[in-house]
Design a protein with these regions (language model features):
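Phosphate/dinucleotide-binding and metal-coordinating scaffold of catalytic cores
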Residues: 1-212, 224-322
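Conserved protein-kinase catalytic-loop segment immediately C-terminal to the catalytic Asp
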Residues: 217, 222-225
Length: 322
């Protein structure tokens, strides 16, 4: 970051989500000073935090890795319900959790997990949690580093669930943070080459094509870093594939027409960018995936949609390898 005020504002990244914006308003978090006093600028991506110079408080008192989360704030973040007007704990990661979908962090014993809902309000809404599970399944079959996902009902809402992949020792920095201005695929490849190799980035791009992931962007992939030194360790495991595997497709949609209307955020088309970045090792993975079939994720997932997702996988692999 260039300016400390910009950094603080960035820690309030979740405030555009309706429930979080309402919560921050109810808690009186209207200024940077309010936000620092209440939330300490804490996040689960690193170990930075803030306090007043004269404040008698330590990292052990506020760490999101060491303290219980505020269940009320988590519930509000997830579905917009909860108890307002009460004293809330500062140890909540919700204020600094990015993304437009309603979500919350929960601690179950030593495990911290993210629960994320699907969309609402229209006929083809709500399939995004299934997409996370399906994407994780094909990434597992391809032996590609990824965050595992399951699906469950949480407070009566369908949600995907995945474990936290950072810790007090290892943090996460999204890709766009490493570039001062606009950047393209060649810039990212060069950056990866300078930090251990570009195979993982190439795998991500090709597998996004296989999964028809329409929402891969520089905020939902990045690198693991040493929280003590800031040094880059490696590319982070793949996560946030809730817009892969045709979540918005409807039963009456023509398959070929639908595929022709969607594309990636990185590259001109799924097939062209995958062909440009594929390597011999990745090609071998795609050949092996010809025999792979997605399994029913359960929880009411429609049979027609499962068939469409498998058909999409077959089509994408055939076109990439052609």
């Amino acid at each position: 970051f260039v300016d400390i005020n910009d950094w603080i504002d960035g820690r309030q990244i979740a405030k555009h989500r309706t429930s979080i914006e309402r919560l921050m308003r109810e808690l009186g978090l209207t200024t940077r000073h309010d936000f620092i006093s209440m939330a300490r600028c804490l996040a689960l991506t690193d170990t930075f935090w803030m306090k007043r110079a004269d404040e008698d408080i330590s990292w052990n008192d506020v760490s999101l890795y060491r303290n219980p989360f505020d269940d009320v704030i988590a519930r509000i973040a997830f579905d917009g319900t909860g108890i307002y007007g009460r004293q809330n704990s500062p140890t909540s990661p919700e204020f600094a959790t990015s993304g437009s979908f309603a979500k919350c962090w929960v601690r179950e014993g030593d495990q911290v997990s993210l629960l994320k809902r699907g969309s609402e309000g229209y006929a083809n809404a709500g399939f995004e949690p299934y997409s996370e599970v399906l994407a994780a399944e094909v990434l597992q079959a391809a032996f590609i580093d990824h965050v595992p996902y399951t699906i469950e009902n949480f407070h009566g809402k369908l949600a995907s669930k995945c474990p936290l992949f950072t810790s007090e020792k290892v943090g996460f920095v999204s890709a766009h943070r490493f570039f001062d201005g606009p950047f393209d695929v060649e810039d990212v490849l060069a950056f990866c080459d300078a930090h251990g190799g570009d195979e993982s980035f190439r795998e991500m791009i090709v597998m996004d094509a296989v999964m028809a992931n329409v929402d891969r962007h520089a905020g939902n992939y990045g690198f693991l870093v040493d929280n003590d030194t800031g040094g880059i360790l490696r590319m982070a495991p793949l996560f946030d594939q809730n817009m892969a595997c045709l979540p918005m497709m409807m039963e009456h949609d023509d398959f070929d027409v639908y595929l022709s209307m969607i594309g990636p955020k990185i590259g001109a088309s799924f097939v062209s960018i995958a062909r440009a970045l594929i390597t011999s090792d990745i090609r071998a993975k795609l050949v092996a995936l010809k025999d792979f079939e997605y399994t029913d994720p359960g929880m009411g997932y429609p049979a027609w949609k499962l068939a469409a997702v498998n058909r999409c996988k077959d089509r994408m692999i055939a076109d990439i390898l052609a």
